[in-house]
Swiss-Prot record:
<dbReference type="InterPro" id="IPR001810">
    <property type="entry name" value="F-box_dom"/>
</dbReference>
<feature type="domain" description="F-box">
    <location>
        <begin position="12"/>
        <end position="60"/>
    </location>
</feature>
<dbReference type="Pfam" id="PF00646">
    <property type="entry name" value="F-box"/>
</dbReference>
<keyword id="KW-0833">Ubl conjugation pathway</keyword>
<protein>
    <recommendedName>
        <fullName>Uncharacterized F-box protein C05B5.5</fullName>
    </recommendedName>
</protein>
């Protein structure tokens, strides 16, 4: 008959007092989610885990949107651990509450509710940074909304300050007045000043002027070594056809390699005679084989202009509307080499 270890003052096993060699052996049988849960049992166990970090993080994704707060760790063995704090908008009686999901190979799905989801998000993120090896990790994707300005500055300074980011997206879907636009661009500048090198930057704002309403999206591509600080021109501009003509001429003359994609969609048609005035273009067909981004118009879509560039050419696609129906695209090629 086997013997059983009962939990008494004399016989209980104190995990913390075990030698580090035993700790490391135990950790070999635990996955990241189990390590995370174990770290929350006591401060002493948390310290033990800090001294024996087993899992190295390869990529980190962060999202601080209006309705979702999320961080995701991808480890060197391709295991993914993610936490999501999101607004349960599909259940009206939970509108002000958030749920979190922590997943390890889709095996775990836990739900809790928090009065302060931002504090819960920060607590979980700080804890994950401390117990896993993030020294050589990359910040792969970072999605930010200007309304989360205070949350951004509460992120661990040692993690954010000077850290390189491969893909940074900042958007504001409510920038429909001058104050909102000013706030959004100042937020973008504040983020870029704290970050290190940003490889790809995507800025998206809904804008309106006296004569027009439009979505504005601009994407930059940066080198590995330079700071990326875009100007304010695209945000404060009303983007009539003359402005777009000036933009294209400036790009052709100065060959700014940072601008890779520029798209606006407005509740109007674009006059290509004005937009391309003084610019030599070649009619282009996507079947000619250039690998570029294409935007598919829908029946309810508005007019749009897409500028897509690389080092030696650019393509401009102008979409037209006829009532509520899309009339398709005209495509123009600029050869710059």
């Amino acid at each position: 008959m086997g013997q059983y270890l009962t939990k008494t003052e004399e016989s209980s096993l104190n995990y913390v007092d075990l030698p580090d060699t035993v700790h490391r052996k135990i950790f070999e049988y635990l996955n990241p989610w189990e390590i995370f849960k174990l770290s929350r049992i006591s401060k002493a166990i948390h310290v033990t885990i800090l001294k024996n970090k087993k899992f190295a993080v390869k990529d980190i994704d962060l999202c601080t949107d209006e309705n979702i707060l999320k961080f995701q760790f991808q480890f060197v063995n391709n295991i993914v651990l993610s936490w999501e704090f999101y607004n349960l908008h599909e259940k009206p009686y939970f509108t002000s509450q958030f749920s979190n999901r922590c997943q390890y190979r889709q095996q775990y799905d836990i739900k809790n509710y928090y009065e302060n989801p931002e504090e819960a998000f920060l607590f979980a993120f700080r804890n994950a940074l401390s117990i896993f090896n993030v020294q050589n990790s990359k910040l792969k994707r970072f999605y930010l909304a200007p309304s989360k300005l205070e949350l951004f500055f509460k992120l661990p300074y040692s993690f954010i300050d000077g850290r390189n980011c491969e893909n940074l997206s900042i958007w504001n879907k409510k920038a429909n007045d001058e104050d909102e636009r000013d706030f959004s661009i100042n937020f973008a500048k504040a983020v870029l000043e704290k970050m290190g090198v940003v490889r790809n930057l995507r800025l998206l704002f809904n804008c309106s002027t006296k004569d027009n309403e439009f979505d504005c999206e601009k994407e930059y591509y940066n080198s590995e070594t330079d700071k990326l600080m875009p100007n304010d021109w695209y945000l404060y501009n009303k983007f009539d056809d003359i402005d777009l003509n000036v933009f294209l001429k400036n790009w052709l003359n100065f060959r700014d390699p940072l601008i890779r994609k520029f798209r606006i969609r407005g509740k109007r048609n674009f006059n290509t005679a004005i937009i391309f005035d003084g610019i030599e273009t070649i009619p282009w067909d996507q079947r000619n084989g250039l690998n570029v981004y294409y935007y598919s118009a829908t029946a309810n879509d508005t007019g749009s202009l897409i500028f897509q560039a690389n080092e030696n050419h650019a393509i401009v696609k102008v979409g037209a509307i006829n009532g509520n129906e899309s009339s398709g695209y005209m495509e123009f090629l600029f050869i710059t080499f």
